[in-house]
Amino acid sequence: MTRSPDSSQPPTIISTGVTGLDDVLFGGLARNHLFLVSGDPGTGKTTLGLQFLLEGVARGEKVMYVALSESKAELEEVAKSHGWTTAGMRVFEMVPTEEELSPEAQYTVFHPAEVELADALTSVLKEVDEEKPQRIVFDSLSELRMLARDALRYRRQILALKRHFVGSNCTCLLLDDRTVGGEDQQLQSIAHGVILLQSLDRNFGIKRRRLEVRKMRGARFREGFHDFTIRTGGLDVFPRLIAAEHRTKAPKRPVHSGIEALDELFGGGVDSGTTTLLLGPAGSGKSSVAALYVHSAAERGEAAAVFSFDETTATYLKRSRSLGIDLDQHIAAGRVLLQQVDPAEMSVGEFVAAIRTFVEMKDARVVVIDSLNGLINAMPGEDYLLLQMHELFSYLNQHGIMTLCTLAQSGFMGRMRNPVDISYLADSVLMFRYFESAGEVRQALSVVKKRSGSHERAIRELRFTGGSIQIGAPLVDFEGVLTGTPRFAGNLSRREDRGKAGAD
C-alpha cells in the first residue's frame, strides 16, 4: 500500500515485547496506531498485552492497562505467574470489587450493566489525558460491545477511541475475546492492524497454539500461521520458516562417515548442503549409521545435532557406545546436541526453531532428524508436513549443512509401506533391508538415489560385530535382496564358507 505524498517519513516501529512476534512483523508495531488482538479465551491475549506494556516500562515509557473484565488483583496474579510485576504500570480497572460496591466506598466504579458506554469511555479518556501513556491496552472489548447495545453505536465509539489515541502519541492494543458474535469484521476494518490468536485441540497432548497477522496497514509482515507457546515468562512465538529469506552460497564438499566402504557407496562421501533419507524397517541400522556421521563431524571439530523422536537420550548414547561411537565427550564440549523430542508436547514450528537456533549459534555442519515418523505424528496432515519439510531442508541445504533423516517402513520382510512419500525431497536415499542367509537374519544397505554425481550401485552387507559397524563386500551371490525376498544365485560352497567365517 502506498503512502500519501505528505507522509514521506516512515512510521516509528516499537517492539511488542515478544521477539518472535517482532520477527513476524519485521520489527514490531507502528507507533501511535490502534491494533486489534483477537482470540478465544485462554489463547494468550492478556499475556501478550502485559508483555507489550512491560516492554514499554523497560524503555522508560508511561503505560496503562485498562481492565474491563478483570480486577487489578487478578491481573497481578497473571503477571506473578510469569515472574513479572505490575510496578511502573498504571492499572485502571472498571470492574468493582465487593468493597467498592459497598456504601462505604469513597470513589465511583463503573460496571458494564449499570452505566452507558459514553460515560465509561469518557472516564477512560479522562484518565488517559491525565496520565498521557505512550502504550495502552484495553482488556477486553466484550464489555464495551455489551454496553453499546447496537453495532452502529459501538462502531462510532471505537472510531472516536481510535481518533483520540492517534492524536495523543499513544499506541493502543484492543483485546477481543470473540465471546459475542465471533469475529468482528467491522472492528477489524477500523484497526490499523489485526493479530489473531488460535488454540487448536488435539486428541492427545497439548493444544497447538498459533497466530496469524490478518492485516497491517502500510507494513510488511510474514503471512500465514506461526506456532507459539505460553510458558512462564510469556509468549514464545516461532515464525514460519521461509527458506527464500536465508539464501547463502555455501561451498560443496564431501562429508565422510569414518568408514571407507560406506563413503564408497556414495561415490566418495555424502555431499554437504544435501538431504539424505535413510529408509528401511525398524532395527535395520538407520540410527546407528546416522550416528557415524555425527561422530565423524565432531571428531573434525564441527558441530552436529541429533533430534531424536523415538529414543531417549540415555538409550541413544548407550547404543552408540556399544558400537564404538562415543558422543559423550563431544556433548560435554558443546560440539554435539542430542535433544529428545516429544511430538505430543512440541509443535513443528518449535521444532524447526530449535534446529535454526543450534545451526545459527554453533554453525552446525550435520543435522540428524531421527525419525520422520515421529515428526509425522506431530503434524495434522501430510500436505502440511511436506511443505514444512521442503522449507526446512531448503534452509539447511542453503547453509551447506548435510541433513540426515531416518524413516521407518512398516514391516520387516517382503513388501514394505512408507508412512509418507518424502523421498522426492531427498537428494540421496540410502536403503536398508533384512535378508536371510545361512539360517541368519542379516542386514544390507545400498544407495538407490543420488542427485549430484555418481554413486556405487552395489548392495553391501551391514554388520554390527565386535563393538563396531562394518560394511561388507558387495552381495554378488544374492538377487532380490532389496525386495525383502532374496534368492541365492552364487556358488554354494562360497556361501557355506562365509557362513563358517561369520560363526568364527
Language model features: what each stretch is:
Residues 2-11, 113, 122, 199-256, ...:
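Conserved P-loop NTPase
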Residues 18-28, 258-269:
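Pre-Walker A adenine-sensing motif
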Residues 27-93, 265-327:
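Walker A/P-loop NTP-binding active-site region of P-loop NTPases
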Residues 32, 59-62, 87-88, 169-170, ...:
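Short glycine-/polar-rich loops that comprise or flank the Walker A/P-loop
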Residues 35, 108-190, 194, 345-429, ...:
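P-loop NTPase motor core
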Residues 52, 75-80, 177, 181-185, ...:
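Short beta-alpha junctions and helix-cap segments that line functional grooves
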Residues 61-146, 302-380:
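Conserved inter-motif catalytic segment of the P-loop NTP-binding fold
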Residues 69-73, 81, 95-100, 142-144, ...:
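Conserved nucleotide-binding/hydrolysis micro-motifs of P-loop NTPases
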